[in-house]
Amino acid sequence: MENSSSSEGRDPSAFLGEIIGAPVTVKLNSGVVYKGELQSVDGYMNIALERSEEFVDGKLKRSYGDAFIRGNNVLYISAQ
């Protein structure tokens, strides 16, 4: 039986490699959301974003040139 969804059965590191340079949304365990351009991600899920924005309770809180997020704080990464 074939997978109907292209994301099923994919290696997460391959997906992350494909979206380098793309706009992403990163949600933290605390509920804070960052949106920006993915510059790098490592094996520990540490993330570097460029032109990033921080959203708290759905409202823009701050804009950053660069943001570095420690991997153990990441709930998920979503390509926009």
From Swiss-Prot:
The processes (GO biological process) annotated in the record are: maturation of SSU-rRNA; mRNA splicing, via spliceosome; tRNA processing
Q: A GO molecular function for this record?
A: RNA binding
Q: Cite the InterPro entries for this sequence.
A: Lsm6/sSmF, LSM_dom_sf, Sm, Sm_dom_euk/arc
- Organism equals Aspergillus fumigatus (strain ATCC MYA-4609 / CBS 101355 / FGSC A1100 / Af293) (Neosartorya fumigata)
Protein's UniProt name: U6 snRNA-associated Sm-like protein LSm6
Location of the protein in the cell: Cytoplasm; Nucleus
Which Gene Ontology CC terms are recorded? Answer: nucleolus; P-body; sno(s)RNA-containing ribonucleoprotein complex; spliceosomal complex; U4/U6 x U5 tri-snRNP complex; U6 snRNP
Q: Keyword Cytoplasm: yes or no?
A: yes
Q: Which domain of life is it from?
A: Eukaryota
User: Where is this chain primarily localised?
Assistant: cytoplasm
User: Keywords assigned by UniProt?
Assistant: Cytoplasm, mRNA processing, mRNA splicing, Nucleus, Ribonucleoprotein, RNA-binding, rRNA processing, Spliceosome, tRNA processing
Family, according to the entry, reads as follows: Belongs to the snRNP Sm proteins family. SmF/LSm6 subfamily.
Q: What is the lineage of its organism?
A: Eukaryota, Fungi, Dikarya, Ascomycota, Pezizomycotina
The family database entries (PROSITE patterns) matched by this protein are listed as: SM
Q: How does it assemble?
A: Component of the heptameric LSM1-LSM7 complex, which consists of lsm1, lsm2, lsm3, lsm4, lsm5, lsm6 and lsm7. Component of the heptameric LSM2-LSM8 complex, which consists of lsm2, lsm3, lsm4, lsm5, lsm6, lsm7 and lsm8. The LSm subunits form a seven-membered ring structure with a doughnut shape.
Q: What does this protein do?
A: Component of LSm protein complexes, which are involved in RNA processing and may function in a chaperone-like manner, facilitating the efficient association of RNA processing factors with their substrates. Component of the cytoplasmic LSM1-LSM7 complex, which is thought to be involved in mRNA degradation by activating the decapping step in the 5'-to-3' mRNA decay pathway. Component of the nuclear LSM2-LSM8 complex, which is involved in splicing of nuclear mRNAs.
Could you confirm whether the keyword tRNA processing appears in this record?
Answer: yes
Q: Which residues form the Sm domain?
A: 11-80
Q: Which PANTHER family match?
A: SMALL NUCLEAR RIBONUCLEOPROTEIN F SNRNP-F, U6 SNRNA-ASSOCIATED SM-LIKE PROTEIN LSM6
